[in-house]
């Protein structure tokens, strides 16, 4: 005779499927939690790594800013030294010229004229002095105009001043340009050459 199984197999099957579903659901939850944890760990490590890089870059930027400032100070100091060297070289180069100019001032000085003040700014020489007469001042200006080292004397002022009961002097102020022999010829030749090129 055939055997009939009267056990509630459908309920057992349902119960078995329910257990499988719960096991799968638990596995998915555990896997999701593990995935979230690993993702959090990864992003935390990435953020910490980036923060470490940023800190390193900030420190390097501070070091580079200090070096840039130091380089800027060195450039400024170098420029000051170059300017000082140029001034010293100009003074050394002009030393014989200044001696010649003073020699020419003495040579152009006629009798009865003396200088009370002399100021040289660049190539301009401002002279103050006194003379016995206006003719002596005129002689001084003619002598300066004839000099190779002096040019363009300009009389600014002449005043008659009484010194004591009898003496009278003419106080004057004039300006003159310092030049070098051959300098005007060189400028004229350069101007002619420039005109020929045009």
Curated annotation (Swiss-Prot):
Localization in the cell: Cell inner membrane
Keywords: Cell inner membrane, Cell membrane, Membrane, Transmembrane, Transmembrane helix
InterPro entries hit by this protein: Extracell_DNA_Util/SecSys_Comp, PilN
Keyword set includes Transcription regulation: no
Annotated transmembrane regions: 19-39
Domain of life of the native organism: Bacteria
GO biological process: type IV pilus assembly; type IV pilus-dependent motility
Membrane topology classification: Single-pass type II membrane protein
Consequence of gene disruption: Deletion mutants lack surface pili.
Coiled-coil spans in chain: none
GO cellular component: plasma membrane; type IV pilus
Functional description taken from the UniProt entry: Inner membrane component of the type IV (T4S) secretion system that plays a role in surface and host cell adhesion, colonization, biofilm maturation, virulence, and twitching, a form of surface-associated motility. PilN/PilO heterodimers form the foundation of the inner-membrane PilM/PilN/PilO/PilP complex which plays an essential role in the assembly of a functional T4 pilus. In turn, associates with PilM and facilitates PilM functionally relevant structural changes.
PANTHER family: DNA UTILIZATION PROTEIN HOFN (PTHR40278), TYPE IV PILUS INNER MEMBRANE COMPONENT PILN (PTHR40278:SF2)
Quaternary structure and partners: Homodimer. Interacts with PilO. Interacts with PilP (via N-terminus). Interacts (via N-terminus) with PilM; this interaction modulates PilM ATP binding site.
Protein name: Type IV pilus inner membrane component PilN
Species of origin: Pseudomonas aeruginosa (strain ATCC 15692 / DSM 22644 / CIP 104116 / JCM 14847 / LMG 12228 / 1C / PRS 101 / PAO1)
């Amino acid at each position: 005779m055939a055997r009939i199984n009267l056990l509630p197999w459908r309920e057992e099957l349902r119960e078995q499927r329910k257990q499988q579903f719960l096991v799968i659901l638990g596995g998915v939850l555990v896997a999701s939690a593990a995935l979230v944890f690993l993702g959090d760990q990864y992003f935390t490590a990435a953020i910490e790594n980036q923060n470490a890089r940023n800190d390193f870059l900030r420190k390097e930027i501070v070091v580079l800013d200090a070096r840039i400032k130091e380089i800027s100070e060195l450039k400024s100091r170098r420029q000051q030294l170059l300017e000082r060297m140029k001034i010293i070289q100009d003074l050394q180069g002009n030393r014989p010229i200044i001696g010649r100019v003073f020699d020419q001032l003495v040579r152009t000085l006629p009798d009865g004229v003396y200088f009370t003040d002399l100021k040289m700014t660049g190539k301009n020489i401002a002279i103050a002095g006194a003379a016995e007469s206006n003719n002596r001042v005129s002689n001084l200006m003619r002598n300066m105009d004839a000099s190779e080292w002096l040019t363009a004397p300009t009389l600014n002022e002449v005043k008659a001043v009484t010194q004591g009961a009898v003496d009278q002097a003419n106080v004057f102020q004039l300006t003159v340009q310092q030049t070098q022999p051959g300098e005007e010829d060189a400028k004229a030749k350069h101007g002619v050459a420039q005109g020929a090129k045009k």
